[in-house]
Design a protein with these regions (language model features):
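ATP/NTP phosphate-donor binding region
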Residues: 1-59, 66, 70-74, 101-105
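Short, contiguous clusters of charged residues that form electrostatic/catalytic patches at enzyme active sites
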Residues: 41, 63-66, 113-118
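Glycine-rich Rossmann-fold phosphate-binding loop(s) that bind the pyrophosphate
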Residues: 60-61, 84
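Short N-terminal helix-initiation segments at or just after the protein's N-terminus
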Residues: 61-64, 79
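Short active-site-adjacent helix-start/loop capping segments
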Residues: 65-68, 88-90
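Catalytic core of DAGKc-family lipid kinases
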Residues: 6, 10, 15, 19, ...
């Protein structure tokens, strides 16, 4: 299996569990490509060749995961959510094991679920803006809190 892992090291508490997950795949004979997200990364560029992999693993907190999944929308790409954030709400709702070896097995066996994404659009200063989300979207004070936490 060819696996692309896109990881945000700034998510959560900086856990290195994603590397244990990667080792499990490599020891089983799979090929893994790891791309680490920096501050000014372009998700479209990071995921430009996503279709050339058997699975794309998105590793980070809920914000990172939502942004990467939204970037992959409307593309025929199998994805795996790896919980590297603080709350990992989407991951918790999917129901996978958080243990790296178990998650690697599920990934290799192509155990999948379908998940809907939402999209919010608005106009500001004559420009249309669109954002995707996987769990929830907030406005006003909630949005200000989330922006401050990022």
């Amino acid at each position: 299996m060819r696996c692309l892992i896109v990881h945000n090291p700034r998510s959560g508490f900086g856990s290195d569990a994603v590397f244990a997950f990667e080792r499990e795949l490599v020891h089983a004979g799979d090929e893994c490509v790891l791309r680490v997200l920096g501050e000014d990364c372009d998700n479209e560029q990071i995921l430009a060749d996503a279709e050339s992999f058997d699975v794309v693993v998105v590793s980070g907190g809920d914000g990172t995961v939502s942004n990467l999944l939204y970037t992959l929308r409307n593309r025929n790409v199998d994805t795996c959510v790896f919980p590297s954030g603080t709350a990992n709400l989407l991951f918790a709702n999917i129901g996978n094991s958080p243990e790296p070896a178990a998650l690697a097995r599920a990934c290799r066996w192509a155990n999948t679920v379908s998940c809907d994404l939402g999209e919010a659009s608005w106009e500001l200063d004559g420009r249309r803006h669109t954002r995707g989300f996987s769990i929830m979207a907030g406005t006003g004070f909630d949005a200000e809190l989330m922006a401050a936490a990022a």
